Amino acid sequence: MTPPLLLAKPLRRVTLVLGSVWLAGCALVPIQPGATRAEVLAKYGKPSAEVALPAGTRLQYSYQPAGQSAWMVDLDASGRVVSAKEALTLNEFFKIGLGRWTRVDVQREFGRPAAISHVASWPGDVLVYRWLDANTPMLFWVYLDAGNVVQRTGQGLDLPPKEND
């Protein structure tokens, strides 16, 4: 008979894998352009945030901090879907304008961060986003200066906590 303590680690891994599969199922299925706001809300529920856009409204469906996805559904002035996209991708992150974008711009494009962090070598906030790159858990950091302007970005692996952390 295998001692229970030896089963704990493999069981934890199975639980993490099953949890990841379940969370992947939380991703929005494609939303058709032309769908109404009411149809989007009926199908996906209340968004995590709404942001005014020059030509309409953005419904944000962010799964931060636990998830690795954030969907942006853009509606025109009449309340019809113009576009829907996953925001937390490398191509989207590359659009960030260093020295030009502000905290407001970042949160409009990516939704709320998973965390707001601080490091000794940086004077401002660091917005932390969890995302997937080809099924690899990643972190994306957005470094803001004291005026809330983006000065730098970075990315790295989202490593699981060690057993005793």
Language-model features: locations:
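Acidic/histidine-rich, surface-exposed loop or edge segments in extracytoplasmic proteins
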Residues: 81-91
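Short aromatic-glycine motifs in intrinsically disordered, low-complexity regions
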Residues: 29-30, 92
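A cross-family detector of function-defining hotspots
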Residues: 32-80, 97-165
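Short alpha-helical interface patches
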Residues: 90-98
